[in-house]
């Protein structure tokens, strides 16, 4: 029965035999009963005893742990491990959500016409309205304060502080989204306005956006430090740090996932290539008994079933010199090249190379001295 083995299979077989010679009780494992039967069939014996790994580090050369049951898989495939790792659910970060409120959904408040340039009279009127709004705010009349700030904004829409102070009043009414809208405009008009960062940071804290809140409150402290802002910053910092650490962890996991996906794809590509090479018959590592030549033995045996080929081979084997008779027959001559190692037909049959198998050109015969014309009569 012909079969095909790759060079890598031979290396594994040699390693297996070397290991068995050093650890003969290894052959007593249930998985290797057929090998033990083979040894005993030819008069050999396997020492009794149980293989415990010992010098082999508890590992078998074909994988798995020494002493493992035959029906247990030695190791889970790497691809399965990768699939499990890639599909692991991402953990959620635990935050202290005390003080977080439901977001408001009121229509956007009037923001005024930014392109309008206020007159001196309008600026003065807006300043008076701001004073009235501050008074109403001090009396905790927050709706009234918002209405007065709105009038001041319509008169002088380019005043960033008016928007920030109206945002503060919205904050008191537990309307963080409205506060954020006003603070966004205030910071667009004046990016160095500490009040805009302060009140927007507080609004974001109420919505549970701790990382963004910490960023705003930190910036407010840099621009104009006050104790209330610092207290708010300390309140959000623990949750903000947890979120930042969790985000960095997820970024690392994502990077690792991409690396594992790439490695898995590379392994699969290698396996597919190996399968393709094996199915195409390989080349240098194939043999099935006899002298390995350049061809697949199954093809050679098939050609030998041809009566003409079989007769020619018998003729050559009986007299190697007869190979020259078939130099002009491609079917027979090419088959011989497949059988011969390296395809060197001449060397295989004791001749000086492949050209020896072909009829040599007749060499011109030198003229005898008796017939040399020396030009003399």
Curated annotation (Swiss-Prot):
Feature: compositional bias, Acidic residues: 89-105
Q: Which Gene3D superfamilies match?
A: 1.10.260.100, 6.10.250.3420, Tetratricopeptide repeat domain
Task: Enumerate the PROSITE patterns for this protein.
Answer: TPR, TPR_REGION
Query: Which residues belong to any copy of the STI1 domain?
Result: 294-336
Region (Disordered) location: 68-123, 243-302, 344-377
Q: Which cysteines are joined by disulfide bonds?
A: none
Task: Give the residue range of the signal peptide.
Answer: none
The record's section on SUPFAM superfamilies has: TPR-like
Compositionally biased tracts (Gly residues): 282-293
Q: Where is the composition biased (Basic and acidic residues)?
A: 243-277, 355-369
What GO biological process, any one, is recorded here? chaperone cofactor-dependent protein refolding
Which keywords are on file for this protein?
Answer: Coiled coil, Cytoplasm, Phosphoprotein, Repeat, TPR repeat
One term of GO molecular function: heat shock protein binding
Transit peptide found in the keyword field = no
Supply one GO CC term from the record.
Answer: cytoplasm
Q: Highest taxon of the source?
A: Eukaryota
Q: Where are the TPR repeats?
A: 126-159, 161-193, 195-227
Mind telling me which Pfam families this protein's record contains? HipN, TPR_11
Give compartment(s): Cytoplasm
Q: Which residues form a coiled coil?
A: 239-276
Residues annotated as carrying Phosphoserine in the record are: 80
- Assembly: Homotetramer. Interacts with Hsc70 as well as DNAJ homologs and Hsp90.
Q: Which family, according to UniProt?
A: Belongs to the FAM10 family.
Function text: One HIP oligomer binds the ATPase domains of at least two Hsc70 molecules dependent on activation of the Hsc70 ATPase by Hsp40. Stabilizes the ADP state of Hsc70 that has a high affinity for substrate protein. Through its own chaperone activity, it may contribute to the interaction of Hsc70 with various target proteins.
Q: What is this protein called?
A: Hsc70-interacting protein 1
Protein source organism: Drosophila melanogaster
